[in-house]
């Protein structure tokens, strides 16, 4: 009889702690947790991003804050894998590249760049909140603006500011998760 009680108690504790872990995990999926725990994915898997998820991710960019509500951004979503690999050579089939562009040269139009940067971060974080890997690229932007603008069919006068890669990922790899941050004491000053 004592063994049955122990077994029942152990089963109860396992169920209770499992439920508690699920509740904690769900609570840790809020916006602050996504921001604090984000990482730039380096290891992507093949697999498409469903249209409904992609729409949510793009809506996050569209809804980003904008100075004077100018909303200067334009989003070009690249699902064509041949074109995507011209921009990001290690792009994996099914990954999506989202090019964020604005009017101007992409270097001196400060207000537009800041607004587009907010849209880029919103897209990046929305993808991670939905369980996808995401990574922001600025390295390919000059080549993209110089060589691929016509192929991307950017609006007249627009230049790419940044792009976000979105795709499936298995888990956090050592390279992606290894980025340490400076301590608050090194980067923050409170003026009271």
Name each model-derived stretch.
Residues 2-192:
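Acidic, surface-exposed loops and disordered segments
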């Amino acid at each position: 009889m004592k063994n049955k009680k122990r077994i029942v108690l152990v089963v109860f504790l396992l169920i209770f702690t499992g439920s508690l872990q699920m509740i904690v995990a769900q609570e840790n999926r809020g916006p602050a947790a996504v921001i604090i725990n984000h990482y730039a994915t380096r290891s992507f898997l093949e697999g498409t991003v469903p249209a409904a998820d992609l729409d949510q991710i793009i809506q996050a960019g569209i809804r980003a804050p904008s100075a004077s509500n100018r909303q200067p951004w334009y989003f070009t979503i690249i699902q064509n894998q041949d074109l995507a690999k011209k921009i990001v050579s290690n792009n994996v089939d099914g990954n999506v590249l989202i090019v964020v562009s604005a009017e101007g040269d992409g270097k001196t139009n400060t207000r537009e760049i800041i607004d587009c940067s907010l849209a880029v971060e919103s897209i990046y974080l929305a993808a991670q909140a939905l369980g996808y890997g995401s990574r922001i690229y600025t390295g390919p932007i000059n080549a993209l603006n110089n060589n691929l603008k016509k192929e991307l069919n950017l609006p007249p006068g627009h230049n790419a500011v940044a792009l976000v890669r979105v795709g499936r990922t298995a888990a956090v790899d050592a390279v992606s998760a290894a980025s340490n941050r400076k301590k608050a004491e090194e980067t923050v000053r409170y003026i009271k």
